[in-house]
């Protein structure tokens, strides 16, 4: 019996653990250490700084099953997903890594043992082929002499892009930096499938499939292209879980493995589809994986960046569900089957299931409102098409008005053997961007563009004043040697007590004092490993290399510390009251208040908000010690410390504990004891996106001021209603009851007035072709009264056409009533349509009653005068 996908994943990790590798958890799909990446797309992403020598880990061997997404950016498989056997938006990359430990010999030996070992994957050795870089004799000899693969199944791959080392078998991190040859392992699916070995003209067939890539990082590429040996060569390998599962489960397509068969069956049930081989079911089964894990990792649908890619994937899945006949929301229903089939890889999903379902359902409901209209427009445009290309302007209109991404429109066109003018789409998009830039009035933010090579040591945990040396000066984004009085700049120091904004905590303010001048610091930001002090030189001048005394605004820092510690108490209290699915999704901590975003799929009830507030204040009164410990990241996680989404952690981390109540990883500044916070008060709770809630709160003196403000408000209201705080509620209720009674009395008077006016209006009826017609503009009537008056006049006249109009709040209101015996001759909707067109408005309704509005008051008399001729033609 073949292994399940979950069992294959576990076997891989178990094998390398037995070989001394540290099992490292998958990192987030949102890269935390590489701003150049849209999404994590390879197993080595989380180890990039280790390979570059910028990060040290307590282990030299590691193994992972890394979640990856390839949709958007350089690596974009979206348009092929569902139409090929192996393209996915989401996949898992199994990998083993050596950081200056073992090299080619052990990497190849481990791979061969896992693939062919009787107790592991036990693949037939004759089914495996390998490639090596053309000049990598070392790897070739290991495969041939030590492993024993026949020479005809070892293929040397050379340069194929016209330049040295530009080869499928030579890996490079970039134009410079670590690089080296790689060796790929292929599986032969058999003669019954078309295709040839790697390097042959038929290599693009499906017979020989790459299952594992072993990258040997042994060189450091210089700017001039020369390769220098690395002092500690390393290994980075990657094996697609879905591909090896297809091999071990004896199927040729990834969509035929157990995991996808389960998801496809669930998608068929949710959409009502009957053909299990439908490409649309494959699309949906693939897309639910990427969408669920992206939402779980903190991405929410939006119109920019990662959120827009997520929105595109969700909407593509919804469109394919629509093609299958889904008549109701279906996509969110696949979250539970996915969690069931993912096994241990879904552990992070279980507490977030409800939140993920809520986000997906909300997005589906939103898109459903425009999907049908957008598809109708697209169908109409394609029906009129004379060539084979849809113009870019139409594609952009679908994007801008109906939320159709370019790839969704291209999908529809491809199904009809048509294409989209992508260049025209981009021109329309750029024109819109240009209009937006011109209307915004904002220039470039030079500070956001700074690239700083310096390193700053932070001393702000222990000191608020410290000596430092100026190592860089930036003015208008450019490096300078000196700044002078009145100039704004960014000052970088070698050592500082100023906290640089991170982890939601704002940067410090204060002053830098030098012998030659004083620099007022308005903010502190991090630029890589440097701290940039942003502000203005208020006196003298400041030169590169100058010694300064850096003084933090201590009162402001103290308020920030209290608010930051309060966020930790709030986080723990929310998990107590709402459940363990609550996770931090963002925060802001400044000297006035704190803002905390968290995962939860509905608005908090008033009693829940109060209970959270009570719990936090209980912990404040306990005056718990706030303790900081430095420990290994894995030890911190084993201790139960919560690691926060989007944060990058070193091998050694700061663990902040507040008694037994809260334990989190945190690099921020904090109070010494919870009692220092004094008082905690929630001032607002709201939603920011589907599945994301936000709490705003204040502490200490701000919390006390908030209570005083509320007390003053209560006293003021009590005075207005001639009561006190004890009787205020009863007084307000009495006023509400009095208001309701007055509204009721007023409505009765209005009804009486309408009846009287209706009676008098009945005397103004005229005859058109034997039919009673009443057309009247009423100067004193409210728009709401017109309906009642028409009903009264119908009863009074028996058989008639009635048209009433009034002007209120600068707008025209019209109503037409036709008794049922006349609706086969003239319809109320036609009458108001005729009138609305003349007064600059629109309207509609039933044949016997219709209403309209308009903005052209001056045109109303002429419009009413035109009714007689219209009715004479119809009656």
From Swiss-Prot:
Enzyme Commission number, as recorded: 6.1.1.7
GO cellular component: cytosol
Stored SUPFAM superfamilies: Class II aaRS and biotin synthetases, Putative anticodon-binding domain of alanyl-tRNA synthetase (AlaRS), ThrRS/AlaRS common domain, Translation proteins
InterPro entries documented for this protein: aa-tRNA-synth_II/BPL/LPL (IPR045864), Ala-tRNA-lgiase_IIc (IPR002318), Ala-tRNA-ligase_IIc_anticod-bd (IPR018162), Ala-tRNA-synth_IIc_core (IPR018165), Ala-tRNA-synth_IIc_N (IPR018164), Ala-tRNA_ligase (IPR050058), Ala_tRNA_ligase_euk/bac (IPR023033), DHHA1_dom (IPR003156)
Subunit organization: Homotetramer.
Source organism: Sodalis glossinidius (strain morsitans)
Cofactor binding summary note: Binds 1 zinc ion per subunit.
One annotated GO biological process: negative regulation of DNA-templated transcription
Compartments where located: Cytoplasm
Protein name, as recorded: Alanine--tRNA ligase
């Amino acid at each position: 019996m073949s292994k399940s996908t979950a069992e294959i994943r576990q076997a891989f990790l178990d094998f390398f653990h037995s070989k001394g590798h540290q099992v490292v958890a998958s990192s987030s799909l949102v890269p935390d250490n590489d701003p150049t990446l849209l999404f994590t797309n390879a197993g080595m992403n989380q180890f990039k700084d280790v390979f570059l020598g910028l990060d040290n880990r307590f282990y030299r061997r590691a193994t992972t099953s890394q979640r990856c997404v390839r949709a958007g950016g350089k690596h974009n498989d979206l348009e092929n997903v569902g139409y090929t056997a192996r393209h996915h938006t989401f996949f898992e990359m199994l990998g083993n890594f050596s950081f200056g430990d073992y090299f080619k010999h052990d990497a190849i030996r481990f791979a061969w043992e896992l693939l062919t070992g009787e107790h592991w994957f036990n693949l037939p050795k004759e089914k495996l082929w390998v490639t090596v870089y053309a000049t990598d004799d070392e790897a070739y000899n290991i495969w041939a002499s030590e492993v024993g693969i026949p020479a005809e199944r070892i293929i040397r791959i050379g340069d194929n892009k016209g330049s040295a080392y530009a080869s499928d078998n030579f890996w490079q991190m970039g134009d410079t930096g670590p690089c080296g040859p790689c060796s790929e392992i292929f599986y032969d699916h058999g003669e019954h499938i078309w295709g040839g070995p790697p390097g042959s003209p038929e290599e693009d067939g499906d017979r020989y499939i790459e299952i594992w890539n072993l990258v040997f990082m042994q060189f450091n590429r210089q700017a001039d292209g020369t390769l220098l040996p690395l002092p500690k060569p390393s290994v980075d390998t990657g094996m697609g879980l879905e591909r090896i599962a297809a091999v071990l489960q004896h199927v040729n397509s990834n969509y035929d493995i157990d995991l996808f068969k389960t998801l496809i069956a669930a998608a068929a049930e949710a959409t009502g589809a009957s053909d299990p081989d439908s490409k649309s079911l494959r699309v949906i089964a693939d897309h639910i994986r990427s969408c669920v894990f992206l939402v779980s990792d903190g991405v929410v649908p939006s119109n920019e960046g990662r959120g827009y890619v997520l929105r595109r994937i969700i909407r593509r899945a919804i469109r394919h569900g629509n093609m299958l006949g889904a008549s109701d929301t279906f996509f969110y229903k696949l979250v539970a089957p996915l969690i069931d089939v993912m096994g241990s890889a879904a552990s992070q999903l279980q507490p977030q299931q409800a939140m993920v379902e809520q986000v997906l359902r909300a997005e589906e409901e939103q898109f459903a409102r425009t999907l049908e209209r957008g598809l109708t427009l697209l169908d109409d445009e394609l029906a009129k098409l004379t060539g084979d290309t849809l113009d870019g302007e139409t594609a952009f209109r679908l994007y801008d008005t109906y939320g159709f991404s370019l790839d969704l429109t291209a999908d529809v066109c491809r199904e009809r053997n048509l294409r989209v003018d992508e260049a025209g789409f981009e021109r329309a998009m750029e024109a819109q961007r240009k209009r937006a830039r011109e209307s915004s009035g904002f220039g470039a933010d030079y500070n956001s563009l700074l690239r700083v090579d310096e390193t700053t040591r932070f001393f702000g945990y222990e000191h608020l004043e410290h000596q430092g040396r100026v190592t860089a000066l930036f003015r208008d984004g450019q490096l300078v040697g000196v700044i002078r009085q009145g100039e704004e700049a960014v000052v970088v120091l070698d050592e500082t007590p100023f906290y640089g904004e991170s982890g939601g905590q704002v940067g410090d303010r204060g002053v830098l004092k030098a012998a030659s001048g004083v620099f007022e610091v308005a903010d502190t930001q991090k630029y890589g490993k440097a701290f940039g002090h942003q502000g203005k030189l208020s006196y003298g001048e400041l030169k590169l290399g100058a010694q300064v005394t850096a003084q933090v605004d201590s009162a402001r820092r103290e308020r920030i510390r209290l608010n930051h510690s309060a966020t930790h108490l709030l986080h723990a209290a929310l998990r107590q009251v709402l459940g363990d699915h609550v996770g931090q999704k963002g925060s802001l901590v400044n000297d006035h208040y704190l803002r905390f975003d968290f995962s939860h799929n509905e608005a908090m009830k008033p009693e829940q908000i109060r209970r959270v507030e009570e719990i936090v204040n209980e912990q404040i009164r306990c005056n718990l010690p706030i303790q900081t410990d430095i420990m290994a990241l894995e030890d911190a996680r084993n201790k139960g410390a919560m690691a926060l989404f989007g944060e990058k952690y070193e091998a050694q981390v700061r663990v902040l504990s507040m008694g037994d109540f809260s334990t989190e990883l945190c690099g921020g500044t904090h109070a010494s004891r919870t009692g220092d916070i004094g008082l905690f008060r929630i001032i607002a709770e709201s939603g920011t996106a589907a599945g994301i809630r936000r709490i705003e709160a204040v502490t200490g003196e701000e919390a006390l001021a908030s209570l005083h403000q509320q007390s003053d408000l209560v006293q003021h209201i009590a005075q207005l209603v001639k009561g006190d705080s004890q009787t205020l509620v009863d007084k307000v209720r009495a006023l509400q009851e009095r208001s309701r009674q007055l509204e009721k009395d007023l409505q009765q008077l209005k009804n009486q007035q309408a009846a009287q006016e209706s009676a008098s209006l009945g005397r103004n009826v005229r005859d058109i072709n034997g039919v009673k017609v009443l057309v009247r503009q009423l100067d004193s009537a409210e728009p709401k009264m017109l309906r009642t008056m028409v009903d009264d006049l119908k009863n009074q006249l028996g058989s008639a056409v009635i048209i009433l109009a009034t002007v209120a709040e600068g707008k025209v209101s019209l109503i037409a009533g036709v008794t049922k015996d006349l609706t086969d001759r003239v319809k109320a909707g036609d009458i108001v349509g005729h009138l609305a067109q003349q007064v600059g408005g629109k309207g509609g309704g039933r044949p016997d009653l219709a209403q309209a509005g308009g903005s052209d008051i001056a045109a109303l008399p002429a419009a009413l005068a035109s009714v007689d001729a219209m009715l004479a033609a119809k009656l």
